[in-house]
């Protein structure tokens, strides 16, 4: 009953091995999350080829920094999302980044594209998978202008002030394998109630030198269970039900 709600499946070279590992530890579903223009079609292709994966399409703020043609290409990205609206389960990974991306000249375009992605999510009545590193205040301010079915803040490690604001708004928070060693991620787990927690690998991001894989979310579940002092079996059911609320389309497609 384990579900990885945030994984960049297009970046794996040995996708068959990833699937085998995932199945072996009870991973039932994985949301494959796009980041770049070039990843959009590959994500859809993977999800059409392997029933473990479900597509999420969107533009990551890092793409604005890397792809100098993004402003010209964004219309084609939007068209692709609309073309695949029946199969995508959320809009993501989208958001703002003022931590890793230091060039402030890119911030206005980040915000413009973030708003375009949120407009799409609102139009399609889809949840969003949010990146907010170093830009928590701006992300939260922007989200207030949109009527979205659900918001998942992925790998939150920012100020407690905005964590508490997100909790008050009813946002969900997906937890990565970094929970095993990261004080900010442990704090997120401590403060967020179990009925608003989700699991993610963010693979293939590395954790202590190991490539992140969906199979790792079993360890994430066990670590959360320790922190929350909840039996892992009970927590697994709770988080599964949380996932059904946030991403209902992966259970209907």
Stretch-by-stretch model annotation:
Residues 1-253:
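Mid-domain alpha/beta scaffold segments of enzyme catalytic cores
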């Amino acid at each position: 009953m384990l579900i990885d709600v945030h994984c960049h499946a297009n970046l794996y070279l040995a996708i068959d091995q990833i699937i085998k590992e995932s199945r072996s530890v009870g991973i039932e579903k994985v949301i494959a999350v796009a980041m770049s223009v070039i990843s959009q079609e590959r994500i859809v292709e993977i999800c059409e080829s392997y029933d473990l994966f479900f597509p999420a399409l969107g533009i990551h703020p890092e793409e604005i920094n890397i792809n100098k043609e993004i402003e010209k290409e964004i219309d084609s990205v939007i068209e692709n999302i609309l073309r695949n609206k029946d199969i995508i389960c959320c809009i993501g990974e989208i958001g703002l980044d003022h931590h890793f991306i230091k060039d402030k000249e890119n911030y206005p375009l980040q915000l413009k594209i973030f708003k375009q992605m949120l407009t799409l999510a609102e139009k399609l009545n889809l949840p969003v998978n949010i990146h907010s590193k170093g830009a928590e205040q701006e992300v939260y301010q922007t989200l207030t202008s949109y009527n979205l079915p659900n918001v998942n803040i992925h790998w939150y490690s920012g100020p407690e002030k905005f964590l508490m604001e997100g909790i008050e708004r009813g946002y969900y928070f997906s937890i990565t394998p970094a929970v095993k060693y990261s004080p900010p991620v442990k704090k997120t787990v401590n403060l967020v109630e179990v009925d608003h927690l989700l699991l993610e690998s963010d693979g293939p991001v590395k954790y202590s030198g190991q490539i992140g894989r969906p199979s790792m979310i079993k360890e994430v579940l066990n670590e959360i269970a320790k922190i929350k002092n909840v039996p892992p079996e009970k927590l697994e059911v709770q988080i599964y039900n949380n996932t059904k609320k946030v991403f209902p389309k992966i259970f209907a497609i």
